[in-house]
Amino acid sequence: PDGLDFTNYDTTMSGEPHRWGDYEIGEKIDHVDGVTIEEAEHMMATRLWQNTAKVHFDATHRDDGQRLIYGGHVISVARTLSFNGLANAQMIVGLNGGAHANPCFSGDTVRAWSEVLDKADTSAPGVGALRLRLVAYKGDAVFQLNRNDPKRPNWRYA
């Protein structure tokens, strides 16, 4: 947007000191926290998104009797989790795609990590862009974390 200027942005307001210049292409960020998916929040969110697929609402539509959690809800949870590690990100400029690789059910705990794919400088003062790959998962982390990263001494790693 015209007039965008983050030159004097105060990182103490977000509680995280890292800005665009601190991230490196290829870096993987563990977003640390997890969220256990609840039936009620899934049902409400799925209705708000106007997804009417019966597998999300009617337990009799699956042989195991479980409602399948709507992938859009999992994506939203992952995006929320990504604020831990990307707290100074100010806007999403685009979503380039998504895949639902595995099922999610009520009671599953979702975690997330991101990989920095690319960086771009912009003409706006104090503003840069990161191209990220955000991955939601349940279970153990799917990559080895650098637990001794001097840039992030206060991060807890799962």
Model features per residue range: what roles?
Residues P17-H18, Y23, T80, F143-K151:
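Intrinsically disordered, low-complexity boundary segments flanking structured domains
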Residues W20, H31-G34, A45, A78, ...:
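Generic structural hydrophobic/aromatic packing signal, biased to beta-strands
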Residues I25-G26, I69, S106, G126:
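Solvent-exposed loop and beta-edge segments used for protein-protein assembly and interaction
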Residues D63, I69, V74-K119:
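Hydrophobic beta-strand-centered segment that forms part of the acyl-chain substrate-binding groove
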Residues P1-L68:
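Catalytic strand-loop segment that frames the active site of acyl-thioester-processing enzymes
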Residues P1-N8, S106, W113-A158:
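HotDog/MaoC-like acyl-thioester-processing domains
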Residues A53-V55, V93, G98-A99, A129, ...:
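Short, intrinsically disordered/low-complexity patches at protein termini
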